[in-house]
Every structure is written in C-alpha cells, then in structure tokens.
Curated annotation (Swiss-Prot):
GO terms for cellular component: cytosol. The keyword Cell membrane does not apply. It comes from Arabidopsis thaliana. This is NADPH-dependent pterin aldehyde reductase. It is an enzyme of class 1 (oxidoreductase).
Length: 242
C-alpha cells in the first residue's frame, strides 16, 4: 500500500480509450477532469444535480455526442440505483469511476454547525460514495477489472479548525477506500486520491479570495487525468496524491 504518494507521470502517456464515470461533474474538479478526458478521446459519463450546468458542459465536451450526462443526486440511494441501470443500458460498465461529488460546511466551530449542515456533508461525501460503490462494484466484479477513485483531501489525512465535518468525511473516505480495497477481486483497484489544493468554489468557501493563489482546475486536470488513466490493479488500497 502506498501512503500519500505523489504522481509524476508524463502528461502525454498514451492509453487505450476508457469509459469514465465522474460524479459531481458539473463544476470544479469534476468538470475540469471531464473536459480533459474528452479532449483525449475518452468517453465521459457524468452526473450532477443541475440539468442546466450539465447542458452547458455537454456543449463543451469534445465529440459531445459520445458522452452521457445524467441528473442524479448521489445522496439518494434510489437515484444512484436508477443511474446505474441507465448507464449500463446506454454505455455499459464504466472502466473507471471517480467519486468526486462533494461539499463542505461553512467555516464554523463544530458546536456552531447545525445538525442539518453536518448531515449534508456526511450524506454527500460519505454516503454518496457508498451509494455509488453499492451499485457499481457488483457490475465490475464479474469482469475482474475496474478502477475506483474516491476523492479525498489533505484534510482527510490531517485536521483543520472550522471544517471538522469535512475533515471527518474525508477521513472516512480514506478508511472506506482501504477497507473496500480488501473486498474487491484481484484485477480491480480502489484508491483514495488527494487532489491537492485547487482554486474551486469549495476552496473559496474556506479561504476566501486567497483561493485564487492556487492552481486552476484545468491545469490540475492535465496531471490528474494522466494519473487516473494510468492506475492499475497494483495501486489497489493506495492513498495517493496528485
């Protein structure tokens, strides 16, 4: 198992065309990754809650008719189940799944975070990932192949004031990923991936204007896409960093 291993692969690595499912695809890292993968000739399957944002993304994807974007809420088990059926029917079983959908609490001490806000972070960041695993891993098992990337965070390996719910959710992702890695068949891989510090809406909610000092999602996506596309069964159980 690799702990917090940085990836330094070449951006021009040539890999076979893949079908990649990305949750939370309509903005931030998910959107940037989708655009980069499509540009490289891979098929993107994506989900998000906003149909308006999905429509906008569809028009920007290279070879836009090859991709499938669906409205779904990962917090809802039934929504993910329905999405899985639709994806298998229209595109088959994804080669790679990137569990990217996530949210963060407004900067607050834990005793100032409402129960509703705490639940929303956990339901999205932890239960949302579990829902995807529940419905897609059984589809991958018979093929004895498939890569699952669960987006973690530096705050899933450390702690920070004012974002305790988010930290807890990402620590959960680290543990969930390591445990599930021991449950899948040989040939598959489940990893936790710390994307690094990127200038997204989520970061802005924590850092304010200082978020603009960090790299943009599209620059990050070039490195992240190469890393994700080159993951193998040998990476199973890894705790990785872009």
């Amino acid at each position: 198992m690799t702990m917090a291993t940085p990836f330094s692969g070449a951006a021009n690595s040539i890999v076979a065309a893949r079908t990649v499912l990305i949750t939370g695809v309509s903005k931030g890292l998910g959107r940037a990754l989708a655009l980069e993968l499509a540009k490289r000739g891979h098929t993107v399957i994506g989900c998000a809650r906003s149909q308006e944002k999905l429509t906008a993304l569809q028009s920007e994807l290279s070879s836009s008719t090859n991709h499938l974007l669906l409205t779904a809420d990962v917090k809802s088990n039934s929504s993910v189940e329905e999405m899985a059926h639709t994806i298998v029917e229209k595109k088959g079983v994804p080669d790679i799944i990137v569990n990217n959908a996530g949210t963060i609490n407004k900067n607050s001490k834990i005793w100032e975070v409402s129960a509703e806000d705490f639940d929303n972070v956990m339901d999205t960041n932890v239960k949302g990932v579990a829902n995807v695993l529940r419905h897609f891993i059984p589809l991958m098992l018979p093929r004895k192949q498939g890569i699952i990337v669960n987006m973690s965070s530096g705050w899933g390996r450390s702690g920070a004031a004012l974002v305790a719910p988010y930290c807890a959710s990402k620590w959960a992702i680290e543990g969930l990923s390591r445990a599930v890695a021991k449950e899948v068949v040989e040939g598959m891989a489940v990893v936790a991936l710390n994307p690094g510090v990127i200038n997204t809406e989520l970061l802005t909610s924590c850092f304010g204007n200082s978020a603009s000092l960090y790299q943009a999602p599209d620059a990050w996506a070039v490195k992240a896409a190469t890393m994700i596309l080159n993951l193998t069964a040998g990476d199973n159980g890894g705790s990785l960093t872009v």
